[in-house]
Amino acid sequence: MPKQDSLWLKSLRWIQKHLVHTIVVPQDPFADLNLDASRPLAYVMKTESLSDIAALSEITTKLGLPSPYEPLVVNGVVAPRVVCLEGRKPLFGERASNEPFLECFMRLLAVHKEKPELDIQLVPVSLYWGRTPGKEDDTMKAAVLERENPTWLRKCLMILFLGRHNFVQFSNAVSLRYMADEHGTDMGIAHKLARVARVHFRRQRKVMTGPVLPNRQAMFHSLLKSESLRKAIQEEAASKKISETQARETAIEYLDEIAANYSDSLVRIAERFLTWLWNKLYSGINIKGAEQIRQLHHDGHEIVYVPCHRSHMDYLLLSYILYYQGMVPPHIAAGINLNFWPAGPLFRRGGAFFIRRSFNGNKLYTAVFREYLDQLFAKGYSVEYFSEGGRSRTGRLLAPKTGMIAMTINSVLRGIERPVTLVPVYLGYDHVMEVATYHKELSGKKKQKESVWQVFGAIRKLGNFGQGYVNFGEPITLQNFLNETAPNWRAEVADDPEQKPTWLTPAVNVLANRVMTRINDAAAASSITLTSLVLLASEQNALERCLLERQLDLYLTLLKRVPYTSFTSVAEGDGKHLVQQGLELNKFSINADPLGEIVSIDANQAISMTYYRNNIIHLFIIPSLIASCLTNNKQISRAHILGIVSDFYPLLKAELFMGIKDLPSYVNQVLDLFIEQGLVQESDTLSVVTEHTSQMLLLAGSVSETLQRYAIIFNLLAHRPKMERSELESESHLLAQRLGALHGITAPEFYDKKLYNTLSVKLKELGYFSEKEDKSDVERIRDQANSLLRASVRQTIVASVTAEHIV
């Protein structure tokens, strides 16, 4: 390797500095890959390349990592900082032997034998000039821009045309101490290291670029030859009394309507536009858990992303983040309503495939869609769909639509060998552009049809929207899920592939709910969501600034000391910092008087802010319920609190997709924290410390509307034990409207009919609609709910339930 200060390398670095723009994956290798700055470090690269090392040198300088030009000096032994698996490819002739590079491995291993305390970190580094996967019929372009093994001439062309799309990816370090201790230090181990590294680099390239793209028309013809589609076409012809040719043409029309037409060129252009857009919209995008997903890709999993659905921005945000995290944007299942000009064709070339809201018993369309989805999985393309089926209008997760999840499981049952893994994704925003529209729709206004004018209208209103949040939840590998749910599933499917297993529908429902629960497990508690939660629990949606900051400090402590899950993310900073962030985004108002500052939510903004509160209310609903038990009882035992929480938890779990694994332990940890923080004192029983009553009342306020709903339901059930589910839903909704009008409850979800349907389904599952005479459970929970309400609210509910018109 030429010396760093040689004229040749200086000239090369100067040229590349002006032609090359490099993106680093991950952005902070020290933090994301747990590199140890105190231990020696060497780089492993696939191919020796002056331009690659020059690009790496620029990055290591910015990150504070050792320069690839600096030799590695350990225990008197001098070795190159970069170990390459193979030499440069000459313009003509054979590549040089890789023996010099194996000798580097040998020298580094030998030093470990001599010095037991030494542990060199071997960090694989991959460089990519562009990320085009190529097409199945690609010839000329592949020849000119051969990316895996380019000659110096081809590399010059790549830098010239693709220099602005250079990616440098660092991987987890390999401990040479471990290799030396476990496997020895001979030449055989050096060869083994080289083989493992080659496999790693091959897989890494597949993760970064994705599989080759199909020729769309060739793919259509291939799909039409499949046995299931041939059979569906024959059945369509017979049922509609048309020729098979006509039925086949209909199938082609369906394929053309559904199928994506992924274009790497469009993705590169979109990347530049989206970089501009995010910089204009957001002050930052916070990402958690991307490394585990990269590893799943690397291990050969078929990845299906299942995000929550807050905004039309979701389609763009997740694809953009995955691209910059060194993964390929997925093929996205989009509603057919988004297939309008010019957005539809652009979305399609960005990887969207379109799905009708309802298949309406159209067997041919169903068969075409299933076969297309199977093809995506078989070819190794990652897929994304929104299991909620539409955007949440309240900020809470919607009950899942199980169609796409069922199709995914069916693809596994039909014999996909690679592990298929669902990745729940929490998407959050400090500002959702559509919130105002959502509340108009909830109040009865008809939903507007998507159009290009809506897009232009949204872009015209772009401003400072704070931060975005992308948290990857705990993955679910479907083969493991099926082994857990139906241990003999492989044998059952092999015996009768056409027969639908009896356990399939219940398994799909369980899986859908597990996905939603794991999305909520990965929630992001941000400055906006936390501050909204506090202010909306106050009487006038207003608090003294110092009290607001103190309450936020308590919530931050609670989330950090008693974490909801390890996948949840919590805002950085203290309460003071969070309040300031909210004020800078104009989400809250501040007024000063001689006694201090008051932070409030404007009356016309209160309904909108419930959306952000609802994003994270599940994180605080149990602590809030505990606080409600404490503030409504002068003395109360731990056992009594746990009993109340245990009675309400099944409903909370169904409504808010909660997944607390050990409820008694969680309740006790929260109580212990309250005691440690001086909020609660304990002798034989628990009681609130007088000077902290206001803090506990504020925390208790977050569960009040939920308890009011439960009080309505259980008062109705206790008063009319034999009422039907449909009656309970309609009369609960009617009472909620009355209660809201009398007591000023404006939260949209309080009047959401779907929510009462979800609760009634859970109540039936729990046996509350049974014919048995003993209604002590219903009466007990009714009394518990009533005891936790304000007297005026309780009186309204009881009086309304017993009134003649409701009976």
Curated annotation (Swiss-Prot):
Record-level GO cellular component terms: plasma membrane
Coiled-coil segments: none
Pathway linked to the protein: Phospholipid metabolism; CDP-diacylglycerol biosynthesis; CDP-diacylglycerol from sn-glycerol 3-phosphate: step 1/3
Principal EC category: transferase
Localization: Cell inner membrane
Catalyses which reaction(s): sn-glycerol 3-phosphate + an acyl-CoA = a 1-acyl-sn-glycero-3-phosphate + CoA
Keyword Mitochondrion found: no
Domain of life: Bacteria
Membrane topology: Peripheral membrane protein
Subcellular location, principal: membrane
Residue positions of motif HXXXXD motif: 308-313
Keywords: Acyltransferase, Cell inner membrane, Cell membrane, Lipid biosynthesis, Lipid metabolism, Membrane, Phospholipid biosynthesis, Phospholipid metabolism, Transferase
Biological processes, Gene Ontology terms: CDP-diacylglycerol biosynthetic process; fatty acid metabolic process
EC code(s) of this entry: 2.3.1.15
Gene Ontology molecular functions: glycerol-3-phosphate O-acyltransferase activity
HAMAP family: Glyc3P_acyltrans
Name this protein carries in UniProt: Glycerol-3-phosphate acyltransferase
Species of the source: Shewanella sp. (strain MR-4)
